Amino acid sequence: LRCLVGSEMCIRDRYMTETEDPDRLMKICRASSSMPLVTPMVNIDGVPYLDGGLADSVPIRRAQKLGNEKIIVILTRNQGYRKKVISTAVQKLYRQAYKSYPNAVRTIFRRSFIYNKTMNYLDQLEKRGEIYILRPHVKPVSRLEQHPDVLHAFYEHGYHLMERKTEEMLKYLEQ
């Protein structure tokens, strides 16, 4: 298991692995799924971490750099989705919450630009047949969604989408 986490100390995203210590592995997993302003930073080896997705939401270039020739990207947002710039009011919240972590604040503020640039790059790769993307065809659920019926319906959509796309995906992998 390789988790992407972001550290104030590292400034950039960082990939962490753990094969020996289950408690440390749990901390890495918690950090890689943390939500700014909602969950606290996770201390790993004395260093505070947030979700590395703040620095690189879809690490496609990392996958390519590692030499992966067949890449399947699973997105949680519909075709064409782009992140909006954070409002001034929310920027103030981030500045206050992470005033001791200016690099984290800068990373959070740049996130929409980096994300949107990555989505444009993914669109180009997909058009050229260089990657395979699975994405929902229905409205995605909120990150804070708690209603079991809504979550189950989105899960079912993903399950049936995968059933329909399996053959197409296998053709991509075999070419």
Language model features: what each stretch is:
Residues 2, 22-24:
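Short Pro/Gly-enriched beta-strand edge/turn motifs at strand-loop
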Residues 1-6, 10-11:
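Single conserved hydrophobic/aromatic residue that forms the stacking wall/gate
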